[in-house]
Design a protein with these regions (language model features):
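NAD(P)+-binding Rossmann beta1-loop-alpha1 motif at the extreme N-terminus of oxidoreductases
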Residues: 1-37, 43-47
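Cofactor-binding loop segments of dinucleotide-utilizing enzymes, especially the Rossmann-like FAD-
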Residues: 16, 90, 138
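Short, charged/polar "capping" segments at the starts of alpha-helices
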Residues: 19-23, 94-95, 143
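Rossmann-like NAD(P)(H) cofactor-binding subdomain of soluble oxidoreductases
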Residues: 39, 45, 49-54, 58-130, ...
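Internal alpha-helical scaffold of NAD(P)-dependent oxidoreductase catalytic cores
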Residues: 67, 78, 103-111, 130-216
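C-terminal substrate-binding/catalytic lobe of Rossmann-fold NAD(P)-dependent oxidoreductases
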Residues: 212-228
Length: 228
């Protein structure tokens, strides 16, 4: 939200929890997730789903993966044909094994779905630390339109038509990251983590290719970059 506000866009932040909306609007700081980062006064907060969706040209969907479908269902009645929905969550839906973008497209077929992913910790983006990401859409012109909205001097955005590969890389890297954390906890060293990373990205790429993704996606920001 801060990034888009700094780029000159009017931003409405939505939450399903009215108490959270009221607290953020009053304190102008997310003390739980982004302590010390001031939220500009011109960013609005609302729990009114219809108002926020209908007022927006681009919706950035930033919810935990188990709630992607329920949130998409909540938005669906108000989304206009062709309206952009950019998913930034990472995961696979447990019951269906669908990517989060596939879930969005299933629940909101009238939207233009996109995914923004890469090595991008929210707290670093909020503090304007240089970051690079990839935006994926089915059509090149949509990717370039969204690229111009998000990109600035400290947030570099590349484009890709491989939405499937971007989603797979972002979701499956979590498994390898957990393994690397376990290796740390067991007192293992760099040798072990190097093996986990290199063999892990190989497994991710094999699965992605089998599902129809572009092999090159997994050597880039949303593959090895996100994993590191």
């Amino acid at each position: 939200a801060i990034l888009l506000n700094n780029n000159g866009h009017h931003v409405n932040v939505w939450s399903v929890f009215p108490d959270e909306v009221e607290l953020l609007a009053k304190e102008r700081e997310n003390k739980k997730c982004l302590p010390g980062v001031h939220i500009p006064e011109n960013i609005e907060f609302s729990a009114d789903t219809e108002y926020v969706v209908e007022k927006s040209d681009v919706i950035v969907l930033a919810v935990a993966s188990p709630y992607t479908r329920s949130t998409a269902k909540l938005f669906a009645p108000y989304v206009k044909k062709g309206q952009y929905i950019v998913n930034v969550g990472k995961g696979i839906e447990e019951d269906t094994l669908m990517t989060l973008c596939q879930v969005v497209e299933q629940e909101i077929p009238q939207c233009t779905a996109a995914v923004l992913s890469g090595p991008s910790h929210a707290e670093e983006v909020g503090r304007m630390i240089p970051t690079t990401c990839v935006i994926g859409t089915h059509k090149k012109e949509d990717a370039e339109y969204l690229q111009n909205i998000f990109m600035n001097d400290v947030f570099r955005v590349y484009t890709s038509p491989d939405m499937l590969g971007i989603c797979i890389g972002g979701a499956l890297k979590n498994v390898i990251a957990l393994a690397a954390g376990i290796a740390d906890g067991l007192g293992y060293g760099d040798n072990t983590k190097a093996a986990l990373i290199t063999r892990g990205i190989t497994e991710i790429a094999r699965l992605g290719i089998a599902m129809g993704a572009d092999p090159m996606t997994f050597t880039g920001l949303t593959g090895i970059g996100d994993l590191i």
